[in-house]
Amino acid sequence: SPRSAASSFGGEGRSFAELDWVVPHLPENKPRHLLGIGLVEDLFIGVSKGIDTFDCVVPTREGRHGNLYTSAGELNIHKGLYRDDPRPVDSECACEVCAVKKISRGQLRQLFKDKNRTAGYLASFHNVYFFNNLMAQIRQAIAEGRFEKLMAEKLSSRS
């Protein structure tokens, strides 16, 4: 509607073709919000097509199931190889889990194994921080005219 403060649309599909036809018709002076899109690759595609904000359950849902997002890619903390791993979830992360409480991969894995509810909270907290930090990096890269370079770096490090 003409009085709308923003435009929003979305859903969990893998096709972004709709953005190519919808975004050119949205007002440029209002935020463009995409719903249900929360994977790293999808955020970069959305931003490259003119989307400003996103929301999705991915960071918390995946966290509750022991899937963590890191600068090197996704990590499933349930795998046995993390049993005695003393490293933080992500050595490049400054979140409370990684940098302040210094919860190791082994400790977090054990919390999940013990069915301790704190495990899902810690993993979700880390994931939300990861995505907030990623979006801050994207905003800075756009302001500095290096979004394409950041996208190439981040996506190549995840393969």
Regions found by a protein language model. Give the residues of each.
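Glycine-rich phosphate/ribose-binding loops and adjacent secondary-structure elements
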Residues: S1-V89
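C-terminal extensions of enzymes
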Residues: D90-S159
